[in-house]
Amino acid sequence: MAVYNYDVVVLGSGPAGEGAAMNAAKAGRKVAVVDNRPLVGGNCTHLGTIPSKALRHSVRQIMQFNTNPMFRQIGEPRWFSFPDVLKSAEKVIAKQVTSRTGYYARNRIDTYFGTASFADEQTVEVVCLNGVVEKLVAKQIVIATGSRPYRPADVDFRHPRIYDSDTILSLGHTPRRLIIYGAGVIGCEYASIFSGLGVLVDLIDNRDQLLSFLDSEISDALSYHLRNNNVLIRHNEEYERIEGVENGVVLHLKSGKKIKADALLWCNGRTGNTDQLGLENIGIAVNSRGQIQVDEHYRTEVSNIYAAGDVIGWPSLASAAADQGRSAAGSIVENGSWRFVDDVPTGIYTIPEISSIGKTERELTQAKVPYEVGKAFFKGMARAQISVEPVGMLKILFHRETLEVLGVHCFGYQASEIVHIGQAIMNQKGEANSIKYFINTTFNYPTMAEAYRVAAFDGLNRLF
């Protein structure tokens, strides 16, 4: 068994692992990264964010072709199979792997591919994919192993018609009807994707409102557009059992309902990838979902071991994970790059997409904050009309007296891009955070960003 010494060893090469490794390497530390796949990128690149967003992009293009009257001069609506659409995602994955492999090489970061486990607080043993065992000794270690779909013991995921959000990418046919159990972010995104391919989707929600952490108006808009695309949303339902049959799946609900479909996609929760790390050897405990508790510096119970990304739970976003990993390494190298990551915009890639940052109306009302609302509807925006993207709106919440921007909520075309302008203003200190910025700033025309100016005028006109 060969022994290699490093300053920092990072377990996982997803967004959190990459962020930690790059920051430590640029600070002059000798760094190694371990991943259990034969390629870098983590779950985000291979099974999560990248393939699902690439799928969504392809489906949006199909939907635009099939609904835009101009294209009727070319031909009738076209329908594509799920495997056909998946091919475009596979091309993006390959490009991402090539790019990220280059990042590690340029920064002289050693990569190991295999299963890592702790021998002690400074030693990690790696069983490489070729069977060779390597021992990595480091002063500091960052756990960034990510998460995987939660699989309850009473659901038979070996059945060929029962999938989770990882295995759905191996779906070799296009089901006529699909049950999606779990109406969180992933469930809603896949409901949009499959309904866009003409699949009849039953979306099972354990709660009484979709994505209740969103502003209520945005959540209601999402519900409307999913239903408008033939997604049947069933609220306040829980499964009794899931029965795999020869030609599909039967979902038995506690309410007494039975639903049959060609396949079932399980999207109800995630579990931290910690069960094979040997954490019991170093005294680190995990919660019931396999997640590790950390302090504000992303340090675990063991002083030289840090954790970041999905493996620590909230907010479980690739964007936040990258910053958490970078901040964890910043705590290690003390180069001033540490910050506690809590100001994170929400990006939900449904069709249409959603993005928000800051407080919702519900939160401000409960806190008795005197706020006002400014709105811009995309159907009136020149750029949206040109792009034939009339669905959506931008909503700004601001303080009636100080004019401070308190929240930005966007639904529709380019929402995840638009939100960052509001985020930049909200991050300004004192009087610099003001809705008047949007009034006193000249925006390019026609653009979607111009919605801020329209919404600001709308909101200020409500004051008296």
UniProtKB/Swiss-Prot annotation:
GO terms for cellular component: cytosol. FAD binds at residues 35-44. Its EC number is 1.6.1.1. Its cofactor is FAD. Its main location: cytoplasm. It catalyses: NAD(+) + NADPH = NADH + NADP(+). NCBIfam families: PRK05249.1. This is Soluble pyridine nucleotide transhydrogenase. The gene is sthA.
